[in-house]
UniProtKB/Swiss-Prot annotation:
Disruption phenotype: No visible phenotype at 4 months. At 10 months, gradual loss of body weight, increased liver size and reduced adipose tissue mass. These phenotypes further progress to 18 months with significantly smaller body size, hepatomegaly, increased intracellular vacuolation in liver tissues, markedly reduced adipose tissue with small adipocytes, accumulation of autophagy receptor Sqstm1/p62 and autophagy-related protein LC3 in liver, and accumulation of ubiquitinated insoluble proteins. It is a multi-pass membrane protein. Glycans are attached at N1022. It comes from Mus musculus (Mouse). It is found in: Lysosome membrane; Late endosome membrane; Endosome, Multivesicular body membrane; Cytoplasmic vesicle, Autophagosome membrane. Residues 1-44, 66-225, 272-422, 480-919, 968-993, 1059-1069, 1128-1169 are cytoplasmic. Residues 247-250, 444-458, 941-946, 1015-1037, 1091-1106 are lumenal. This is Polyamine-transporting ATPase 13A2. It comes from the Eukaryota. The gene is Atp13a2. ATPase which acts as a lysosomal polyamine exporter with high affinity for spermine. Also stimulates cellular uptake of polyamines and protects against polyamine toxicity. Plays a role in intracellular cation homeostasis and the maintenance of neuronal integrity. Contributes to cellular zinc homeostasis. Confers cellular protection against Mn(2+) and Zn(2+) toxicity and mitochondrial stress. Required for proper lysosomal and mitochondrial maintenance. Regulates the autophagy-lysosome pathway through the control of SYT11 expression at both transcriptional and post-translational levels. Mg(2+) binds at D867, D871. It holds the Pfam family E1-E2_ATPase.
Amino acid sequence: MSADSSLLMGSTPPSYGTLTTGTSIDPLSSSASSVRLSGYCGSPWRAIGYHAAVWMLAGIPWLLFRWKPLWGVRLRLKPCSLAHAETLVIEIKDKEGSSRQLFTVQVQTEAVVQGSLELPPQAQAEDGRSQAAVGVTPEGTWQDTSELHRQEEAKQVLRYYVLQGQRYVWMETQQAFCQVSLLDHGRTCDDVHCSSSGLSLQDQATRKTIYGPNVISIPVKSYLQLLADEALNPYYGFQAFSIALWLADHYYWYALCIFLISAISICLALYKTRKQSLTLRDMVKLSVRVQVCRPGGEEEWVDSSELVPGDCLVLPQEGGVMPCDAALVAGECVVNESSLTGESTPVLKTALPEGPKPYCPETHRRHTLFCGTLILQARAYVGPRVLAVVTRTGFCTAKGGLVSSILHPRPISFKFYKHSMKFVAALSVLALLGTVYSIIILYRNRVPVREIVIRALDLVTVVVPPALPAAMTVCTLYAQSRLRTQGIFCIHPLRINLGGKLRLVCFDKTGTLTEDGLDVMGVVPLKGQVLLPLVPEPCHLPLGPLLRALATCHALSQLHDTPVGDPMDLKMVESTGWVLEEGPAAGSAPGSQVLVVMRPPPGGPRQQEEPPVPVSVLCRFPFSSALQRMDVVVTWPGATQPEAYVKGSPELVASLCSPETVPSDFSQVLQSYTAAGYRVVALAGKPLPIAPSLAAAQQLTRDTVERELSLLGLLVMRNLLKPQTAPVIQTLRKTGIRTVMVTGDNLQTAVTVARACGMVGAQEHLAVIHATHPEQGQPAALEFLPTESSAVMNGAKATGYPTVPEPQSCHLALSGSTFAVLRKHFPKLLPKVLVQATVFARMAPEQKTELVCELQRLQYCVGMCGDGANDCGALKAADVGISLSQAEASVVSPFTSSMASIECVPTVIREGRCSLDTSFSVFKYMALYSLTQFISVLILYTINTNLGDLQFLAIDLVITTTVAVLMSRTGPALTLVRARPPGALLSVPVLGSLLLQVALVAGIQLGGYFLVIAQPWFVPLNRTVPAPDNLPNYENTVVFSLSGFQYLILAAAVSKGAPFRQPLYTNVPFLVALALLGSVLVGLILVPGLLQGPLGLRNIVDSSFKLLLLGLVAFNFVGAFMLESVLDQCLPACLRWLRPKRASKKQFKRLQQELAEHPWPTLPVGSVR
């Protein structure tokens, strides 16, 4: 019977077999595009065979299956359908299929408490079906989930498995497993509001069985468990095999030292692992008492671990830490989300609007309280309580996503790591050949069979360097430490090397390229059909709709008598002089409730048609990046009806206004300000035919408020470039790294900023792409519009920086709507656009993520730098995401910089290049060290001797370990260059270097051997006595002395500095180690002294021969450095001359070459259909 393997695609949410690893914060960040499940169940005969094999082979199969669980599963169990599976094998592949992960999990069963999953009567469908599971979604999607609960209740058993903290339940109707977070997929905002009456105890118990407890559990293993895991690691397994072999070969001191070092290493690893687990557990541990609603108006205090999706929380006014993800359904909250997004500014959360739209935590993040965030203040307006409905719990929450990303980082597909595994495999083959050679030689020398076996196996421990993984890890640890000292924190050290391969970096604009704060330049009022000149001080405006809109159209709140909120809103309100207060305004009806009150300044202008009075905000629709606008509904004492004000992007607000209220020169005036780099916000308003009360205003929908508005004017704000921006951009461009701006701001403003900072040079062409959707029988069309090359920023000519024109016909700029049209209607043109586009404006957060993914499909190594607010998805999807934040770690990116500028980007790239180049050097050195010792042992095996016990100890621990650790300390080069470190280990330069250096090493050792046996005073060793009993002898002394120098020479030769690292002389500890060890080796040759006896060296009395040995060392030193120098300087040119230039394997390079030969678009251009 064949295994039932279900291929589940991650791009189809309705499919319940989908394994989606995204969280509510970042649903698009999953690297998995396909997941395959294979089911297995028990087989008595297979189990008997398995246990028999384990017992007969002394547990070796058990150890092997521990390292390769899939082999054990296939041997013990038989394939079966997923419906009957007891064990699952899960295969996860990324989008490009370059990385593959295998997991083995057990299917668990749990009894379901008999109970109803139906919502209160007002939430039930007409036929009485429950909507609690997923809400009402199109077609019959919710029916499958409802059927799940009915089936499971009938059988009173639930089948599920847990992978990386996420729970997946069996869907009988779909015959697949479904992630529990998808059970609520399709729930509408109306469904969420219907849950505000709470769950019954039976419903809560049943849901807890399905969803699991609301805890983010960090497994903390005991020291005994950790010891078993560490000791049974393949690395330590190889060490144990080697130690046993050395003991059998009478290498007691060496075996004892390696054992002690391994034991200390294990103990340190156990302590560090357990300490990290305990620290992380203490950080994420959250257990608080919360108040929940029950049907019938009852309230109950429960532990936060008991919460399930559908519970309704009563939030205290003093706030606290959120124990789950929840949708706010009544009241408002001021929240600090810095622990997740890195955004230090408190955020105002308002009640989720009712309606048939599907609820999505990302889309409705302004109405969602995320787990782990701190509620600073909660206020109720309609009703006595602030209510929030639980939407996600445990690892499905935002905090759970952060913890999961730390515990289970996304696998990295890196050519260097793949090649290193292949190289180790090649060394293993070489060890096998050496083993065969040694067996033949030792047999000819009539060595006993026991000795032949031990010596042959000993070669394996020589050729395959067991310390290689540790040496490679040291490289990234040094880089991580250097980054930390510069205020850059990294939670995924393996991504440091990826920083060295960056080809393109995307930047957010506001707060990243430009200053975070905005200065109000003035207001452009609208009078009739004419936009008046700029009024520099809005506080001098006459009292009217425009001034009231400026004073009230914001999401500010008061915390401890201090206004908090978006910096732009704070500046706008500050420019009016109005003061924020909370509570009813003076003169309001008794008992009336309002959100906030804006009070006019006491000493305002006297020339007013009516005296200034406080204005109360009745309703707010917060700003949405997707909608690009926010709305408020206000009233004031004496007003007969409230007014609505809208603030947002000029183009969008104008489209919401009645055409007769938008002046004919609106576009020209707007362009005059945006072309100068100013940020422009439009304001509009209208009276509302409702009662001026909070209750009436809260019933309004956003569509009602935003219909048939009247334009009021424009708010012009100045957003200066940060002083570090232009130099950093020029540095990146000079080194061949593309820079791209991805912003939600106006296209013209973004283009101006791009020219001002040097992304687009003064002499470079730029064209704007404008796309139109297909309509009225006309197909979608693209239009390319050339722009002027003047770079004026905020009214002043930008500082000029020399730019290096990029190899492309022209720069392109486009908006988010155009990007959407390109993806949908012009997929073949999209790659051509992406390799030339420099400015992406009016991009929604999800479009930023899509852009990063599209660039990665062109095989760019993509970096993303942003402030972590609207860039969460893009920062996490990028190969190297850098969040500008004061927090040490955030959910949004592997790198977090406390620097408030993009200077961190070149720093990460320099450290990445240094780390990658160092990794190559360390790998080469460890390989050369193994091969050098391999050659020494083979030479000595040939004459029936070997290196001594303490000689191995001196080479492996004193010499090699010291230089391997210290050579990684060299810091990065101070400047970036156009060259990039190699990414492929199996390349001609690397392999050529290894082969030539090994040939030189072998030649020197053989030369020394033949020189010593040619001396008249030479006495050959007694070949009838096996090693190490035939020590000391001349042959061993010469080979050991020469090889000792070779380890130092090779370490220095492969530790070149430029262009990615600082010069060798800057690494003082490394130079001191080389000098000291070299001096000791020189002393061993010239004046052996006290070390001669313990090391088993024979005294050479011929002074001229000693100098001859040092001459060989000097020749080896010069030859090694000459080889590296010639290979670096001449080999690339020779390879280009010998072999014809081939097309690049990277798609973006092929496109650039094509565009260089056939420029596109050709300016001036028209439309493309």
